[in-house]
UniProtKB/Swiss-Prot annotation:
Protein name (record): ATP synthase subunit c
Species the sequence originates in: Rickettsia prowazekii (strain Madrid E)
Compartment(s): Cell inner membrane
GO MF annotations, alphabetized: lipid binding; proton-transporting ATP synthase activity, rotational mechanism
One Pfam family per UniProt: ATP-synt_C
Domain of life: Bacteria
Site (Reversibly protonated during proton transport): 58
KW Transmembrane helix (keyword) present: yes
Keyword set includes Cell membrane: yes
Residues passing through the membrane, by range: 8-28, 52-72
Family: Belongs to the ATPase C chain family.
Gene from which the chain derives: atpE
Keyword tags: ATP synthesis, Cell inner membrane, Cell membrane, CF(0), Hydrogen ion transport, Ion transport, Lipid-binding, Membrane, Transmembrane, Transmembrane helix, Transport
Subunit structure comment from the entry: F-type ATPases have 2 components, F(1) - the catalytic core - and F(0) - the membrane proton channel. F(1) has five subunits: alpha(3), beta(3), gamma(1), delta(1), epsilon(1). F(0) has three main subunits: a(1), b(2) and c(10-14). The alpha and beta chains form an alternating ring which encloses part of the gamma chain. F(1) is attached to F(0) by a central stalk formed by the gamma and epsilon chains, while a peripheral stalk is formed by the delta and b chains.
Length: 74
């Protein structure tokens, strides 16, 4: 295999990282909705923590995207 095909295989693996970030964010917000349904008085605190968690999960997806762009253009 040449280096170009290996670059594209690496980019495909980076897509798995983006998929994982999307799954993580969806799990965070589905858990948030069920937690708010169980305890509406704690909604403000739960929402703040969920947004922090979603930001961290989305950062992993952005890191995967940046690495994929570095692989494409290097």
């Amino acid at each position: 295999m040449d280096i170009v095909s290996l670059k594209f295989i690496g980019i495909g693996f980076m897509a798995i990282g983006m998929y994982g970030a999307a799954l993580g964010v969806s799990n965070i917000f589905s858990s948030l909705l069920s937690a708010i349904a169980r305890n509406p008085s704690a909604a403000e605190n739960l929402q703040r923590m969920a947004l922090i968690g979603a930001g961290l999960a989305e950062a992993m997806g952005l890191f995967s995207f940046v690495i994929a762009m570095l692989l494409i253009f290097s």
